[in-house]
Curated annotation (Swiss-Prot):
Cofactor: Mg(2+)
Residue ranges of domain ATP-grasp in the record: 9-244
One Gene Ontology cellular component: succinate-CoA ligase complex
Entry-linked NCBIfam families: PRK00696.1, sucCoAbeta
Gene name as annotated: sucC
Source organism (scientific name): Bacillus mycoides (strain KBAB4)
Keyword hit for Zinc-finger: no
Protein name: Succinate--CoA ligase [ADP-forming] subunit beta
An example molecular function term from Gene Ontology annotations: succinate-CoA ligase (ADP-forming) activity
Pathway recorded for this protein: Carbohydrate metabolism; tricarboxylic acid cycle; succinate from succinyl-CoA (ligase route): step 1/1
Claim: Nucleotide-binding is one of the keywords in the record: yes
Length: 386
């Protein structure tokens, strides 16, 4: 789950991480009032959307007086920002962060992520702050420094100091930088983050170490123990199909293709997408109905898949273990009738009650193409979609 920058900064502030003072605004008048309350000569007007690259897209402006705050707020609020992370459709700006200006001396990058190869949290940092870390990793990987953190003891002071020295934090500010990184790590662990990224971390003219931006991403499976984080969720920033899927405990992720996929089990779902690509097709989604799907869940899964106008055909690939193939077959038939399905539909069933499931499909009188294997099903749906 993602949250907005201003929310992330509030979380970090509670862990002793230094961030600029700022206020959120939902209207132009609120933006002007927020700037008045901050009382600084320079304010930064920042679009709040769940995506990076806002500055390059015109979503971050420096205002030197209240009139400029009003002008920038009017120009940003309600507009659609298109960045490298939003896709071509972009995201509408519905809120702003009005923040006090900062006398920046130097920009850095600091981030915490999960390294799945080592099963550890890794602290990454670079002198190349303010630019995309992926770009730095590609062009000058030697400028990225890493510290792998033992989960038994957590981030150690010597590791934070080593990072600070490696990225050339001024000696007199190393203590502040260490405190900053320790606070960031505490927030990462206690709030079950999957990413905590500060880009840029800055040193200022008045001798402070501060987070000018904050990107926090949380493990959705752990939100039950962080109710305060769950309250920060902004549904307007999320895909409506993903929200609908979550109501029925369906794991749905939209993709760019035209072949809808309905599968049980994440591993089988990924294998299904791979084999569709192998036969030169393009999956339109990842959709895992889970191990205990009912006819109702299958029906809702169909509706979610079909809400994507790019879908030209559907491949249902089910291995019945806990889930019975006859239940899936009944769900497929019910869903097909309810939604008035006119697109090509290929179904591959295997496992518990498979013969009964196939019998139900064959006797349904509906235009359902049966597949004998996963490869057979992938070839058939790719051929039907054309």
């Amino acid at each position: 789950m993602n949250i907005h920058e201003y929310q992330g900064k509030a979380v970090l502030r509670s862990y002793g991480v230094s961030v600029p003072n700022g206020k959120v605004a939902f209207t132009v008048e609120e933006a002007v009032e927020a700037a008045k309350e901050l009382g600084t000569e320079v304010c930064v007007v920042k679009a709040q959307i769940h995506a990076g690259g806002r500055g390059k897209a015109g979503g971050v402006k420096v205002a030197k007086n209240l009139e400029e705050v009003r002008t920038y707020a009017e120009s940003i609020l309600g507009t659609t920002l298109v960045t490298h992370q939003t896709g071509p459709e972009g995201k509408e700006v519905k809120r702003l962060l009005i923040e006090e200006g900062c006398d920046i001396k130097k920009e850095y990058y600091v981030g915490l992520v999960l390294d799945r190869a080592t099963s550890q949290v890794v602290l990454m940092a670079s002198e190349e702050g303010g630019t995309e870390i992926e770009e730095v990793a590609e062009k000058t990987p030697e400028k990225i420094f890493k510290e792998y953190i033992d989960p038994a003891v957590g981030l150690q002071g010597f590791q934070a100091r080593r990072i600070a020295f490696n990225i050339n934090i001024p000696k007199e500010l190393v203590g502040q930088a260490v405190k900053f990184m320790m606070g960031l790590y505490s927030a990462f662990i206690e709030k079950d983050c999957s990413i905590a990224e500060i880009n840029p971390l800055v040193t200022t003219g008045d001798g402070k170490v501060m987070a000018l931006d904050a990107k926090l991403n949380f493990d959705s499976n752990a939100l039950y123990r962080n109710k305060d984080i769950l309250e920060l969720r902004d549904l307007e920033e999320e895909d409506s199909k993903e929200i609908e899927a979550s109501k029925y405990d369906l794991n749905y992720i939209p993709l760019d293709g035209n072949i809808g996929c309905m599968v049980n089990g994440a591993g089988l779902a990924m294998a299904t997408m791979d084999i569709i690509k192998h036969y030169h097709g393009d999956p339109a989604n990842f959709l895992d109905v889970g191990g205990g799907a009912t006819a109702e869940k299958v029906t809702e899964a169909f509706k979610i898949i079909l809400s994507d106008k790019n879908v030209k055909g559907i491949f249902v690939n089910i291995f019945g273990g806990i889930m019975k193939c006859d239940v899936i077959a009944e769900g497929v038939i019910e869903a097909t009738k309810q939604v008035g399905l006119e697109l090509p539909l290929v179904v591959r069933l295997e496992g518990t009650n498979v013969e009964l499931g196939k019998k139900i499909l064959n006797e349904s009188g509906l235009n359902i193409v049966a597949a004998e294997s996963m490869a057979d099903g992938a070839q058939k749906i790719v051929s039907l979609v054309g």
